[in-house]
Amino acid sequence: MTLKKIFLFSIAITCFVIQFSSAQDLAILKYKGGGDWYSNPTALPNLIEFCNDNIDTKMKAKPETVEVGSPDIFQYPLLHMTGHGNVFFSDEDAENLRNYLVSGGFLHIDDNYGMQ
């Protein structure tokens, strides 16, 4: 599968999930470990703009940032995790994220290192 097909598939899945969820806002996942969780700052705003323009969602243009161990992650149907390098989850962080995913949350992970 080419990178372009994977990217388009990711957009389609993301838009599908957003369209059928009652809450439409997305959040950026903040994590420990020095993996640059804040990198690629235009990716999620561009996705939000695309979805708002093309499938009539009404998401806030600027996504919120939530920490992986926070109960606030349950307020968002989709979390976006980006960066490269080390990612560290404490046992509590991992349990919180696991509970989020088991409860139906969706985690989109973008390793933006740029190598093929």
Spans of model-derived segments:
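Bacterial N-terminal signal peptides
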Residues: 10-18
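Bacterial N-terminal signal peptides that target proteins for export
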Residues: 1-11
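Short alpha-beta junction capping motif
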Residues: 26, 78-116
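Aromatic-Pro/Gly-enriched surface loop or interdomain linker
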Residues: 21-78, 82-85
